[in-house]
Amino acid sequence: MNTDVIIIGAGPVGIFTAFQAGMLGMRAHVIDSLLSIGGQCTALYPEKFIYDIPGYKQITAAALISNLAEQAERFNPTYHTDQFATHMDRLDTSFVVKTSKEIEITAKAVIIAAGAGAFDYNRIPIESSHVYEGKSLFYSVKDPSIFTSKVVVIAGGGDSAADWGLILSKLARKVYLIHRRSKFRCSDSTFKDLKSLEETKKLKILTPYQITGLRGSGGQISHIELGGLTGESVTLEADYLLAFFGLKPSLRHLEEWGIEITHNCINVDPLTCSTNIKGVYAVGDVAHYDSKLKLILSGFSEAATACHHIRETIIGGDVYNFRYSTNMNEVFR
């Protein structure tokens, strides 16, 4: 399949890059390793508020992704989720990117908006866990309502586990929060809220325990087995298991493509966001230059910079004239 721009990464900056490309008349295909678009905003903290997005006093990460996707939708970007960009080959005037699902996309330019790299979830190290994934075992939450009046076990000791413990305690019949260490990594105020909630019997904290086994049938968990550090064991009846063990980022494929990487970031020219390979750009947290600020806001600006440079110097066709969006009514009708 052919397009104008391939965008690697469908976090907030990647989605906005698709919008910017479309606004300039460029077709975009977007590749992301996670099951749904949104990057860490969707996978790790969808219900957390972000306070530094212009025009919003506050907005949840999930709402920001929804708004960005709706904004880009008018230009019909094509999303390829649940797959990695594994190969990039340079042709005379274009690039061919191949994904882990054997999809090949040809484009005149590539924009890498991969955050800290392609992400995959750190999964439960239990051989049978894949049987339950997507049915009663989840590594992120898309629809909290499915946990209403259910018994939910949450495993993990960071912000995601703690935050979802607080949120789901309002919906679930019972929430168990499991951590392999005695001390959680969440903020002191969040942990204080968890301990207060534990007094209501809606939530129970079990530490230091690890999940040692899953029992159930047809993909539906019925029991979760825990092992303590001193050898004791506990079996919980449960309907769902949420495992928040973080994400594994990797830039390995990008290094293999010959892209110049320093300290796990891609070196770019701040004036154009271009890399050491002509036609390949990087924006968002993965891009590095002097005085770089790793903010979503900065990534939005870099997306515009890269797309305008591609439209002016690579795509060709009609004469390029910079215009403000207020003078592009024919595009937004």
Swiss-Prot record:
Cofactor: FAD
Pfam family, one: Pyr_redox_2
Record note on cofactor: Binds 1 FAD per subunit.
Keyword Ribonucleoprotein listed: no
Top-level taxon of origin: Bacteria
Keywords recorded for this protein, A-Z: FAD, Flavoprotein, NADP, Oxidoreductase
Catalyzed reactions per annotation: 2 reduced [2Fe-2S]-[ferredoxin] + NADP(+) + H(+) = 2 oxidized [2Fe-2S]-[ferredoxin] + NADPH
One Gene Ontology molecular-function label: NADP binding
EC number(s) recorded for this UniProt protein: 1.18.1.2
UniProt binding sites for FAD: D32, Q40, Y45, A85, F119, D285, T326
Annotated family: Belongs to the ferredoxin--NADP reductase type 2 family.
Self-association and partners: Homodimer.
PANTHER family associated with the record: THIOREDOXIN REDUCTASE 1-RELATED-RELATED
Protein name as it appears in the record: Ferredoxin--NADP reductase
Organism of origin: Neorickettsia sennetsu (strain ATCC VR-367 / Miyayama)
